[in-house]
Amino acid sequence: MTRGTIQNRDAFLQNIAKRLGRSPRLSGVSQPQWDYAPQWTVFAGYSQDDLLSALREQCKLIHTDYIETTSSELAGALKQQVAAYGGGPVIVPDDPRFAEYGLSALLHDEWPAEQTAVHVWNSSLGRQNIDAAEQANVGIAFSEITLAESGTVVLFSRNEQGRTIHFLPKTYIAIVPKSSVVPRMTQAAAYIHEQIEKGAVVPSCINFITGPSNSADIEMNLVVGVHGPMKAAYIVVTDR
């Protein structure tokens, strides 16, 4: 991923300052320190097991299947959940973690031998990736950060992982390393901000996804699957 550039910033800020009737403030500006920060107290002191328990309970409220497994059993758990959702076609990002978590044989050998189509995102294929996502029954990706309070997975889009993997397939499975679970969005935003401060290249598209697609009108009629997958599952890998 290449770093973007900022253009016309100074002219833009000078125009705002002019409208405010003052000169631009180029120094002496610091981030305010708030007297109260209740957002940091949610789940304060929780262990990783406590956070996992909170995530498990939240999944019940957001209509999301919750599965716990270990690295050695992950391939079997993933295969079983894909079968529960009706099988392939499957689409996945080009992510080295699939190999690290022992899923290469399932993706490249076992499923193809069973006539389950697997598409690995390839940026050189362009529109073909989007077409594959549209035709896929299951999209699978790793959660970068997982919010226990809301049951949200945070997904970073990049050349090897287009955002349509998360939205176009009929169903979706997030692989959740236990170590990725944090209390809430506060910690996720702090992590992303920290990466920016370090000069890291942050994805232009960061998706916060909470279970399957849910929409409700003014009469509180819930409709599932209008803007994304109709079903979602989180497979938590407890030894990662």
From Swiss-Prot:
Gene3D superfamilies: NagB/RpiA/CoA transferase-like (3.40.50.10420)
GO biological process: lactate metabolic process
Highest taxon above the source species: Bacteria
UniProt xrefs under Pfam families: LUD_dom (PF02589)
InterPro entries: FTHF_cligase-like_sf (IPR024185), LUD_dom (IPR003741), LutC (IPR022823), NagB/RpiA_transferase-like (IPR037171)
Role played: Is involved in L-lactate degradation and allows cells to grow with lactate as the sole carbon source.
UniProt family annotation: Belongs to the LutC/YkgG family.
Record-given protein name: Lactate utilization protein C
Protein's organism: Geobacillus thermodenitrificans (strain NG80-2)
